[in-house]
């Protein structure tokens, strides 16, 4: 076994010298297993990042280096970090190294483990079929539909509802489609991960989900690699079992952020806004593995934190290039009490074309967007001169646009304990017919508040009856 010694420790970055002259390869895992002077055991894994010359490698630690000292013996495992894959991962919670961190005991030693670094599928293996994934969330299904095997970004600043939307999607897809999900918590709050685990356990969804966490309090090495751990588990379900898998990453920005921290510690020159020079490469290596093949698909839904709501920041801008659909969350809508706060004009999808969604769906979606766009243009006039100065035609546009805006909101299953209202799953055909009828003026006489936080158009009629009673 190839052994070396720690020569330098800079927080999460550790230099190791191998005297035999046989250096471990880049991405190899090195381990330390011993106790320090206080009797506390040190059990650490490092990943080789650079060969410095002089028989020394620079590595990144996957957990805290507290208690580590120079001269500590390090062992080269001879392979990359590998994690458990297959049905054994379902219903369990893991860390970046594939160790179980729930209370259900360790994973059996003989279980299959795959390395977290691997090549993207070959070009000829990729599937070109385009199929819509129904989410049951009206604003998404109507205006920015998700593609099976596609990549979807949920963009938004702090506290606009990205994680709640992800939780609802996990719930809807498990309940309605019975699919397998892998959830990778990348650099987010431990409390949210804990809440999500307990909610999923209560609803029974956890049986179909594998969860991997590298939270905010962990070193950058773990936060940078945990997305690859989750992706490796998802790839096994796709390639070996032919499944259609959902991969949730919350939050992809923290992946970039961790990469930036590691890059600075490794001594690389920073590029724009202080990000790592390898930003586009690292993002590409992750995203290119998330795809549909002839065997199965991985549909990935990624929350993207937008620093200071600035979409031109290199981190969200680099992520944009890889996405098939974007769901933009807007703080202005949360202030109006419209949840989910999805911006119907800024959200996009490659799938919103008549060849994919059908002529009727496409026409209704475009009319909804035109009505909302016209309302947006009229808002300045209304603010200065008031509604009375508008033409009759424009008054009607405003009247319908407000109903459409409220009808795009919806009550979520995962928010039942906050709202006290039952969550709703709305099939696409009901969504399209509901908006078509609003555009035709069928519900012009109903009060606009009846359209708030409802599922189907039938609920609107019921609400209106209660209000008018």
From Swiss-Prot:
Highest rank taxon of the organism: Bacteria
Gene3D superfamilies in alphabetical order: 2.40.10.170, Bovine Mitochondrial F1-atpase, Atp Synthase Beta Chain, Chain D, domain 3, P-loop containing nucleotide triphosphate hydrolases
Membrane topology: Peripheral membrane protein
Pfam families attached to this UniProt entry: ATP-synt_ab (PF00006), ATP-synt_ab_N (PF02874), ATP-synt_VA_C (PF22919)
Record CDD domains: ATP-synt_F1_beta_C, ATP-synt_F1_beta_N, F1-ATPase_beta_CD
Keyword annotations from UniProtKB, A to Z: ATP synthesis, ATP-binding, Cell membrane, CF(1), Hydrogen ion transport, Ion transport, Membrane, Nucleotide-binding, Translocase, Transport
Keyword Nucleotide-binding attached: yes
InterPro entries for this protein: AAA+_ATPase, ATP-synt_VA_C, ATP_synth_F1_bsu, ATPase_a/bsu_AS, ATPase_alpha/beta_chains, ATPase_F1/V1/A1_a/bsu_N, ATPase_F1/V1/A1_a/bsu_N_sf, ATPase_F1/V1/A1_a/bsu_nucl-bd
Catalytic activity: ATP + H2O + 4 H(+)(in) = ADP + phosphate + 5 H(+)(out)
Entry GO terms, CC: plasma membrane; proton-transporting ATP synthase complex
Subcellular location(s) per record: Cell membrane
GO molecular function, one term: proton-transporting ATP synthase activity, rotational mechanism
Function: Produces ATP from ADP in the presence of a proton gradient across the membrane. The catalytic sites are hosted primarily by the beta subunits.
NCBIfam families xref list: atpD (TIGR01039)
Family under the similarity heading: Belongs to the ATPase alpha/beta chains family.
Full protein name: ATP synthase subunit beta
Source organism per UniProt: Bacillus mycoides (strain KBAB4)
């Amino acid at each position: 076994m190839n052994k070396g010694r720690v020569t330098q420790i800079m927080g999460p970055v550790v230099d190791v010298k191998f005297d035999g002259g046989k250096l471990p390869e880049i991405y190899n895992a090195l381990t330390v297993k011993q106790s320090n002077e206080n009797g506390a055991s040190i059990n650490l894994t490092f990943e080789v990042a650079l060969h410095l010359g002089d028989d020394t490698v620079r590595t990144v630690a996957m957990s805290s280096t507290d208690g580590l000292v120079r001269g500590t013996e390090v062992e080269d495992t001879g392979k990359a970090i590998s994690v458990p894959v297959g049905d054994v991962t379902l219903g369990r919670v893991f860390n970046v190294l594939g160790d179980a961190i729930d209370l259900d005991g360790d994973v059996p030693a003989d279980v299959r483990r795959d390395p977290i670094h691997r090549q993207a599928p070959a070009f000829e293996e990729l599937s070109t079929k385009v199929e819509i994934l129904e989410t049951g969330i009206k604003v998404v299904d109507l205006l920015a539909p998700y593609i099976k095997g596609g990549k979807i970004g949920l963009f938004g600043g702090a506290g606009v509802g990205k994680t709640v939307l992800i939780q609802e999607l996990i719930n809807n897809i498990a309940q309605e489609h019975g699919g397998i999900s892998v959830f990778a918590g990348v650099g987010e709050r431990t409390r949210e991960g804990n809440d999500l685990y307990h909610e999923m356990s209560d609803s029974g969804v956890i049986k179909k989900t594998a969860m991997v966490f590298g939270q905010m309090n962990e070193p950058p090495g773990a936060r940078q690699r945990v997305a690859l751990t989750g992706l490796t588990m998802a790839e096994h379900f796709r390639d070996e079992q032919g499944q259609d898998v959902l991969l949730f990453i919350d939050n992809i920005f923290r992946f970039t952020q961790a990469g930036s921290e590691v890059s600075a510690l490794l001594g690389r020159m920073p590029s724009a806004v202080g990000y790592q020079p390898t930003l586009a490469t690292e993002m590409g290596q992750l995203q290119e593995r998330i795809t549909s093949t002839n065997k199965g698909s991985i549909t990935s839904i990624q929350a993207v934190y937008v620093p200071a709501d600035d979409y031109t920041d290199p981190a969200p801008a680099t992520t944009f290039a890889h996405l098939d659909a974007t769901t933009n969350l807007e703080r202005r809508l949360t202030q109006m009490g419209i949840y989910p706060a999805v911006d119907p004009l800024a959200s996009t999808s490659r799938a919103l074309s008549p060849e994919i969604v059908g002529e009727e769906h496409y026409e209704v979606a475009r009319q909804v967007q035109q009505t909302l766009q016209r309302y947006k243009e009229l808002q300045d006039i209304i603010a200065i001169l008031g509604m009375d100065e508008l033409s009759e035609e424009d008054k009607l546009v405003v009247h319908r646009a407000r109903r459409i805006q409220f009808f795009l909101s919806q009550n979520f299953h995962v928010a039942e304990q906050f709202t006290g209202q039952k969550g709703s799953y709305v099939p696409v055909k009901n969504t399209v017919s509901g908006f078509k009828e609003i555009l035709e003026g069928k519900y012009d006489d109903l009060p606009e508040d009846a359209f708030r936080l409802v599922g189907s158009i039938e609920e609107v009629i019921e609400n209106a009856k209660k209000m008018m009673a």
